[in-house]
Amino acid sequence: MENLKQILADALSAVAASESESALDDVRVHYLGKKGALTALLKQLGNVSAEDRPKFGQMVNEAKDQVQEKITERKASLAKAALDAKLATETIDISLSGKGQEVGGLHPVTRTMERIETFFRGIGFDVASGPEIEDDYHNFEALNIPAHHPARAMQDTFYFNPSTVLRTHTSPVQVRTMETTQPPIRIICPGRVYRCDSDQTHTPMFHQVEGLLIDENISFADLKGILQQFLNVFFEDDLKVRFRPSYFPFTEPSIEVDIMRTNSKGEESWLEVLGCGMVHPKVLEMSGIDSEKYTGFAFGMGVERFAMLRYKVDDLRMFFENDLRFLKQFK
């Protein structure tokens, strides 16, 4: 018993005298380690009488706990002293200017999308949205593209199963609106669309804005006037615009729209920017709209394409690489 008291006193004295964590670790190993002084006492329990053995074992364990507690307290005390000393030698000049946080900016695709939406909202169009995972009916059949129609080959589609796809355009939003809303209808449908394509001018996911206007006595002249005005406002220029015949299953007649662009050498050329046309009567009828009473037009454009033209970006993939050197230019 006396030996235990002496060892405990020596251990506590050694802890109190330690001036560093490494010194405390040495004390811990010397008294509490596998070959430590207090641990050795437990190995001598066999030499203690059976009557005194439980009490002696308890006293040794309590001594070990006491030493460990003092080591922990001493470590905390040393850490606090070190921090106080560090703070005492460091000063902060509160008169110095703070480091301002760099302000982020909108992505160029977002900027372009908002620019398009702002124009069409300004002339009375509402913004409509719909699911990106679509059924075959709304993505194809309701748009006059039945199964095995040659036009399906125009679009490389991501299929979940034979009747469920990632939408290849935002036209299904127009169909769903026509199914639930009676004319007059005046909407644009911005959103992500998906096609199996990837190169300098195509990505598997990109953004479209499609528009739809249905009312009585709507003509191609209305479509032409709105698109001419939109292109002039978007590009901030009085553009030369060309409307030429094309083919889309959901419009008749179908038109592709080109604008005249001038390159760095001063050479002019036509560049396709969007597709449009008068809504096919069959599409109106399939959505429950009387094609004898109502007519309408639809148009669609790729947002990234407009962003590339506006910001003079040559490679579409740069919009999706998250390179801050590129994105910081649009702040």
Curated annotation (Swiss-Prot):
Q: What CDD domains would the database entry show?
A: PheRS_alpha_core (cd00496)
Please list the GO biological process terms of this entry.
Answer: phenylalanyl-tRNA aminoacylation
Q: What class of enzyme is it?
A: ligase
Q: Which reaction does it catalyse?
A: tRNA(Phe) + L-phenylalanine + ATP = L-phenylalanyl-tRNA(Phe) + AMP + diphosphate + H(+)
Question: Keywords on this record?
Answer: Aminoacyl-tRNA synthetase, ATP-binding, Cytoplasm, Ligase, Magnesium, Metal-binding, Nucleotide-binding, Protein biosynthesis
Q: Which residues form the signal peptide?
A: none
This protein's major location comes to: cytoplasm
Its Enzyme Commission number(s) read: 6.1.1.20
- InterPro entries, per the entry: aa-tRNA-synth_II, aa-tRNA-synth_II/BPL/LPL, Phe-tRNA-synth_IIc_asu, Phe-tRNA_ligase_II_N, Phe_tRNA_ligase_alpha1_bac, Phenylalanyl-tRNA_Synthase, tRNA-bd_arm
Molecular function, one GO term = ATP binding
One Pfam family cited in the UniProt record for this chain: tRNA-synt_2d
Localization recorded for this chain is:
Cytoplasm
List the PROSITE patterns: AA_TRNA_LIGASE_II
Q: What does the UniProt cofactor note say?
A: Binds 2 magnesium ions per tetramer.
User: Could you say which residues bind Mg(2+) here?
Assistant: E252
Name what cofactor the protein needs: Mg(2+)
What family classification does the UniProt entry report for this protein? Belongs to the class-II aminoacyl-tRNA synthetase family. Phe-tRNA synthetase alpha subunit type 1 subfamily.
Subunit architecture: Tetramer of two alpha and two beta subunits.
Question: Which protein, by its recorded name, is this?
Answer: Phenylalanine--tRNA ligase alpha subunit
Question: What organism does the UniProt record list as the source?
Answer: Marinomonas sp. (strain MWYL1)
User: What phylogenetic lineage does the species belong to?
Assistant: Bacteria, Pseudomonadati, Pseudomonadota, Gammaproteobacteria, Oceanospirillales
From the UniProt record, report the name of the gene that encodes this protein: pheS
